[in-house]
């Protein structure tokens, strides 16, 4: 009888310590910078400068610290360019053809994932210890 009481107390302590081994810290600091975006089409490349949101995530797994930094371009809008040209002196003989252009999407997605195993493994060990204690 005393052994099962001691085992139950050990299982409760294991559950409590498993919960305390999980540490989550969040630090938020908004920062923007300028990034150069290179776009290539038909063997011709062009560069544009865009403001971007900087995001840094630090992940520690088995005492190995890895830092991930991402730069997400922010959508910008440009005012329409005003161009004027002199009136033609002669009527053109051919009608100019127009080629429609496609606009790219300016939506950025940032996702974050915390491995479930990091949170579940200590609790699973404590659960097994508790189940073993109840069987004794």
Swiss-Prot record:
Residues 73-110 are annotated as: Disordered. Keywords: Cell wall, Glycoprotein, GPI-anchor, Lipoprotein, Membrane, Secreted, Signal. Glycans are attached at residues 21, 82. GO terms for cellular component: extracellular region; fungal-type cell wall; side of membrane. A lipid is attached at residue 115 (GPI-anchor amidated glycine). It is found in: Secreted, Cell wall; Membrane. Cell wall protein necessary for cell wall integrity. This is Putative covalently bound cell wall protein 22. The gene is CCW22.
